[in-house]
Design a protein with these regions (language model features):
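Low-complexity intrinsically disordered segments
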Residues: 130-177
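Predominantly extracellular/luminal cell-surface or secreted proteins
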Residues: 92-93
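Short coil-to-beta strand junction motifs in C2/discoidin
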Residues: 84-87
Length: 177
């Protein structure tokens, strides 16, 4: 009886090892990295996770940009297609949202703070400088709805180092390749 228990245990262990080995082989990483491409086939970014892409500016600055699904008229998601996310805000030291742009930091370790705002010309990504936050005298805030004058001192802000119109530079729809 003891020999049968040992033999059965060995058979189960070998079978489990074979299944685990097969799973390990099936899940090996692709030799080609996953990339986000725009509607023209140009590289738009590399995924940090399913909705955060790392976009490289012409100046060499790398910053996170958010994507979201594209929906059909009935509210269903389009298969394999995405577009740039909007809905952020940028704080300015000027009263007309033209100079002194600042954004909040990122909750994700190791990436710059960014904001994406929808403008009449497309979705614009504002990328912060690397460093420590500061307190700024804010005179206006740019939202998707436009520029709003304010007068407030706000802490936790980073100066904007780079700006790119994502819709113009990487026109949607976007897809992973």
């Amino acid at each position: 009886m003891r020999a049968r228990v040992i033999a059965t245990s060995l058979a189960v262990a070998l079978t489990a090892s074979g299944v685990a080995g097969a799973q390990g082989t099936a899940s090996s990483p692709s030799p080609d990295p996953v990339a986000l491409v725009d509607s023209t086939g140009k590289l738009a970014g590399r995924p940090l996770n399913e909705t955060i892409m790392l976009v490289t500016f012409a100046s060499g600055v790398v910053a996170p940009a958010l994507i979201r699904p594209i929906y059909d008229p009935d509210g269903h998601t389009a298969s394999g297609l995405a577009t740039w996310q909007a809905g952020g805000s940028v704080l300015f030291t000027s009263s007309d949202c033209t100079t002194g742009a600042h954004v909040y930091g990122s909750p994700h370790a190791g990436v710059r703070g960014t904001a994406q705002v929808e403008t009449p010309t497309g979705i614009v990504l504002y990328a912060a400088a690397v460093g420590t936050a500061s307190t700024v005298a804010v005179q206006s805030i740019l939202y998707d709805t436009g520029c709003a004058p304010v007068k407030v001192r706000q802490n936790g802000l980073f100066p904007v180092l780079a700006i790119v119109n994502l819709s113009a530079a990487y026109p949607p729809p976007l897809s992973f390749q």
